[in-house]
Regions:
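N-terminal alpha-helical interaction blocks
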Residues: 1-101
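A short catalytic or substrate-binding loop motif that flags glycine-/basic-rich loops and adjacent residues
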Residues: 18, 58-59, 151-153, 222-224
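N-terminal strand-loop-strand
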Residues: 28-36, 139-182, 186-187, 208, ...
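Active-site segment of metal-dependent pyrophosphate-handling enzymes
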Residues: 59-72, 164-166, 206-231
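A gly/proline- and charged-residue-enriched helix-loop-helix capping module
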Residues: 83-126, 130
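Short edge beta-strand segments in beta-sheet-rich domains
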Residues: 91, 137, 154, 209, ...
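Cys/His-rich short segments
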Residues: 110-162
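The catalytic Nudix box helix
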Residues: 181-216, 230
């Protein structure tokens, strides 16, 4: 699973310290992530501040601390002028699903979820004024009306429906993902995760399920969800 990065350890405590030269830079453009030009089969590599500091003059003035893996810190650069970086390009974030090393792939995907959240919280949804970053926690606050916004996490289920030695797979029409997959869907307001399973299965394949067993959970930052797995 994408979050299984042992022996590395993910630290999501919010510690808005300044980057050093060895800190990693994560930069995104819609559904793409900045990576060096390289073969698709090669291990991924994110630029460090020391790699770009001579090319981007204001690099150390517009960063956002994201998280750490082991003792390596990762920072978001929200608007990076890539015309100054001919050795880099934006690549589809979905490429990280199978990228190696896995701890960097996990970092890139998780950072993209935070990038999307920050991008959509630039202005207050209540009064329209620019939002400010809290220095105490991962939160955006409006200095005008005191509205506070925290990262959004959407609960969802993924279900392995079995009958003997068979399992149901489905394919969604009109989706970018063309392969067969397990039944999955988002929880709705006012229902439990277990009720979500029953509703989604009925909606998608018209079946009633029983003997529901919880398996495990998984962060899935591609869609901003926390997946709960069931059989």
């Amino acid at each position: 699973m994408i979050q299984d990065i042992a022996p590395h350890t993910y630290h999501n405590e919010y510690k808005p310290s300044a980057p050093d030269k060895n800190s990693f830079i994560l930069a995104y453009e819609k559904g793409s992530i900045l990576l060096p030009h390289q073969e698709r089969e090669a291990d991924i590599y994110f630029p460090r501040f020391q790699d770009l500091e001579e090319k981007v003059s204001d690099l150390y003035s517009k960063y956002i601390y994201l998280f750490s893996i082991d003792d390596q810190r990762f920072y978001l650069i929200p608007e990076l002028d890539t015309t100054l970086l001919p050795d880099y390009e934006f690549q589809d974030i979905r490429n990280l699903r199978t990228a190696r090393p896995q701890h960097l792939a996990f970092a890139g995907v998780t950072g993209h979820q935070l990038f999307q959240w920050y991008s959509k919280r630039r202005f207050c949804g209540c009064c329209g004024k620019p939002m400010l970053h809290s220095q105490k926690e991962r939160m955006m606050e409006c200095p005008s009306c005191s509205n506070q916004e925290y990262p959004v996490l959407c609960p969802a289920v993924i279900v392995g429906i079995t009958n003997g030695d068979k399992i149901i797979l489905s394919k969604y029409e009109g989706r970018r993902f063309k392969r067969y997959a397990l039944i999955a869907g988002f929880a709705e307001i006012g229902e439990t995760i277990e009720e979500t399973v029953h509703r989604e299965v009925m909606e998608e394949v018209g079946l009633k399920v029983k003997n529901l067993r919880y398996y495990k959970s998984q962060p899935w930052s591609f869609s901003g969800t926390l997946l709960f797995g069931f059989f």
